[in-house]
Amino acid sequence: MRVVERAVIACYLGITIFSGIAFGYEGAFSSGSFEQNPSGVAIHNRVLFKVDEDTVVTTLDVIRKLNILFYSTCPQLVDSVSARSQYYSAMWPVVLETVINEFLMAADAKAKKIFIDPTSVNQEIEAMFGRDLSPFAKFFDMTPEDVFNVVHRILVAQRVEGMMVRSRVMLKVTPGMVREYYQKLADEAAQITQWTYRVLTIKAGLEFLAHKIAGKVQERLNEGSSWDKERLTALVLSQGGQLMCSEEFFREDAQLSVAHRQSLEEINFPEERCGKVLEHASGLKLFVLFNRATKTLDPLDKMEAQLKQQLMMEFAAEEEANYKNKLHARYGFDPATITKLLAEDAPQLFSLL
């Protein structure tokens, strides 16, 4: 899976887990520097968070992450200053938070001696951008080494987070838990009715004629004969009317409008399948009910893998949050820092030229 795709999803469990955007670059820059690059962004570069004695997160780290994300998703707009301006303004708060988390995860990976070999990083870069990285120098003032560091950081962060989340989730989701979850869904399904039906509209030049035709259609349908749209249409036309037939609807209780549900519940199914004639501005309406059944689930053995995946996804989101909270506590990061950095009265982190 490419890094661009993993910016939106992370594969911790061999399944899809939604996460934040993840790119980054580690560097060391003075807190008072000011830089301008070809991307049309004036960077008010300063330290945003100190991870340890050797590593700090700076404004430039976030900008470089935005540069790669923008080029990965919108390469056709790379020379559009207005598009870049809108994109950076909208994405800055999200990327600011995730880049700090990424630095913390990379520090944790280093402590745990979890590494990504350079070959894997280069393969990822080539899969994303090909071998020509010159657009980064032209539009973003980024060297190939900068790009390498960004991709390397995301891969390292993904690996350590995946390992930490997966190991805990695998311990939580047991066969017994899957069976309990299945029974819960089965009990809920037993309270749901599923409806299969169509809505017929009948028109005629005179109101009494329309009612007469609708009565014949209702009678024909309740005789028990099989559904035959062509024969019904011919019947209506022979009586001087018009017939319009909806598609076949398959709905559960919660998906039905109040009017449709009321009309369907009045049908004495299965003794009859066509309800009473209803007047409507667009013509006379007939509800034709083909089936009404209680919702059932497939056997457990057919659903077990799917249910296990759902449970793992739920626990993964919880464990991901727990893992990041522990990192915040370990490295002394207060999430309120993000709010302070984004406050209206806070010093600008970057300007759009």
UniProtKB/Swiss-Prot annotation:
Residues 1-24 form the signal peptide. The keyword Zinc does not apply. InterPro entries: PPIase_dom_sf, Trigger_fact/SurA_dom_sf. The keyword Transport does not apply. GO terms for molecular function: peptidyl-prolyl cis-trans isomerase activity. Keywords: Signal. Belongs to the chlamydial CPn_1058/CT_355/TC_0634 family. This is Uncharacterized protein CT_355. It comes from Chlamydia trachomatis serovar D (strain ATCC VR-885 / DSM 19411 / UW-3/Cx).
